[in-house]
Amino acid sequence: MSGNSSTDMYLFKKSLKELKGKKGKGTELISVYVPAGRRLSDISQYLRQELSQSSNIKSKTTMKNVQSAIEVILQRLKLLKEPLEMGVIIFAGMIPRGGPGTEKMEVYVLEPPEPVKTFVYRCDSLFYTDPLEDFIQDTEVYGVILVDRNEATIGTVKGKTITVLKKLTSGVPGKFKAGGQSARRLERLIDDAAHQFMVRIGEYATESFMPILEEKKLKGLLLGGPGNTKNEFAEKDYLHHELKKKIIDTFDLCYTEEFGIRELLDKASDLLRDLDLMKEKNLIQKFFKELIKDDGGLSAYGEAQVMKYLEMGAIDTLIVTEDIGITRVTVKCNNCDYAQEVNVKTNEMFKFEEQLKTKACPTCGGAMYIDEEKDIIEHLSDLCHMHNTDIIVVSTDTEEGSQISRAFKGMAAILRYKL
């Protein structure tokens, strides 16, 4: 993939969702995964062998469709330039649009976000998309341990997702008023109970984090909690020695459980600037700081305003939410050179197509037709590239991303200069 990573990942996820929804009439949809660095001539030779063997398929319709799909893939391979640093993934096949006879050849060429490792050729009624699921998973994981004398929470932060893996309670009694030997005996019992609680936390942490560490996906551990318990846990040998090496820092917190994890992430933001969650949070907070200024500062929001300023080259950073749901449509006249680009809500495309049938060209009165449909985020990404503007596609899983979606219809921006 090239260009902006958040845009590329959004488009990749969208393509994956579309591919998973495709279904062939029979076992005639072809999926080909070409590994990084693999010679395309080798792949073409393999496909020509499959093309030859497909003549043995009993159903003439299925045979014809399989052969057509293989030939389309062979044609696409000729257009690619070597070496392919990431490899390439190609899907092709006849997809029914309705009843019998409505099948249409569809082909998808994807550049994966990570190198393809294994060659795959598969012919099935569905496109083989399982390996694509692995590509969209965030690989870096932070482990989180929140601890005080009474309770502990073990969790992970992966990309934008916070997962609580285990909640523990200690049963350690609180302070008491007593004297003499009874007090000292009770104090020893409390200390022993606290020690055993720390041991339990360490065991669960090892169980939770060592598999991630062995997969080389554990970027670090963050420890937090009220009081000194967290420091004692970090300094003594409660954690596996390999996990102790991964401790990034400890943080004073008011809370434990999931709210405590969010509090910890706020306090650890300087250390986690590369984490997607922090990138989005900091950028959106910067937008809101501009927005609340008396004159609106360097903020812009809403489809009309943002599109206008973007085409002027006045936007420094564009923020778009994943759920924006808009398609950029190019409408043309079939009689003259008239053309128009409009934004249409994706879930209203059918309605738009029906209305277009009744509209005439404003120039010559000819019939209008849809020439191109493009995801608005892909269109915005192209404009941003033209004007040297940064674009970030944010999730609505976070509070900040959800605010952009609800309050500003999924589109906001930070300007280069005041307009």
Swiss-Prot record:
Keywords carried by this UniProt record: Cytoplasm, Protein biosynthesis
SMART domains noted in UniProt: eRF1_1
Disulfide bonds: none
Endoplasmic reticulum found in the keyword field: no
The protein's role, per its UniProt record: Directs the termination of nascent peptide synthesis (translation) in response to the termination codons UAA, UAG and UGA.
Family: Belongs to the eukaryotic release factor 1 family.
Protein name (Swiss-Prot/TrEMBL): Peptide chain release factor subunit 1
Organism: Methanococcus maripaludis (strain C5 / ATCC BAA-1333)
Gene from which this protein is expressed: prf1
